[in-house]
Curated annotation (Swiss-Prot):
Name this polypeptide is given: Large ribosomal subunit protein uL16
Record carries keyword rRNA-binding: yes
Spans traversing the lipid bilayer: none
Record keywords: Ribonucleoprotein, Ribosomal protein, RNA-binding, rRNA-binding, tRNA-binding
Biological function: Binds 23S rRNA and is also seen to make contacts with the A and possibly P site tRNAs.
Pfam hit, one: Ribosomal_L16
Record carries keyword rRNA-binding: yes
Family as reported in the entry's similarity comment: Belongs to the universal ribosomal protein uL16 family.
Gene: rplP
Record organism: Brucella anthropi (strain ATCC 49188 / DSM 6882 / CCUG 24695 / JCM 21032 / LMG 3331 / NBRC 15819 / NCTC 12168 / Alc 37)
SUPFAM superfamilies: Ribosomal protein L16p/L10e
Any one Gene Ontology molecular-function term assigned to this protein's record: structural constituent of ribosome
Length: 137
């Protein structure tokens, strides 16, 4: 699973996702993509599950680019522990995804295969998505 090699600080604030994505809204690498429609926090496990579903349907043909990275440490306290006594330890890593953000890109496969692969990948994500395609020039 993806996580940063090192960070400046071990723990971060929860934060909010305001407005639309400032960058990463266009296809830069592949011909097809999966774009977020609503704001949500996506975990490293969910990104990995989506990646596996996509590559499995493509039967290792073509290429997949993951355009999001889980750089947000999410903490949690153990069960049945009273409130207080500091912030909990890092439980998992997540990524804040704003609406309009391209999360996955594909290339080297036909459109019907790409559409189905991204549909299977989107089922693993806790977020509404849209299939996008590069306009032929």
């Amino acid at each position: 699973m993806m996580q940063p090699k090192r960070t400046k600080f071990r723990k971060q604030f929860k934060g909010r996702i305001h407005g639309n994505s400032k960058g990463g809204t266009d296809l830069n690498f592949g011909a097809f993509g999966l774009k977020a429609v609503e704001p949500e926090r996506v975990t490293a496990r969910q990104i990995e599950a989506a990646r596996r579903a996509i590559t499995r349907h493509m039967k290792r043909a073509g290429r997949v680019w993951i355009r999001i990275f889980p750089d947000l440490p999410v903490t949690s306290k153990p069960t049945e522990v009273r409130m207080g006594k500091g912030k909990g330890s890092v439980d998992y890593w997540a990524c804040r995804v704003a609406p309009g953000r391209v999360m996955f890109e594909l290339d080297g496969v036909p459109e019907d295969v790409a559409r189905e692969a991204l549909r299977l990948g989107a089922a693993k994500l806790p977020i509404k998505t849209r299939f996008i395609q590069r306009i032929a020039e």
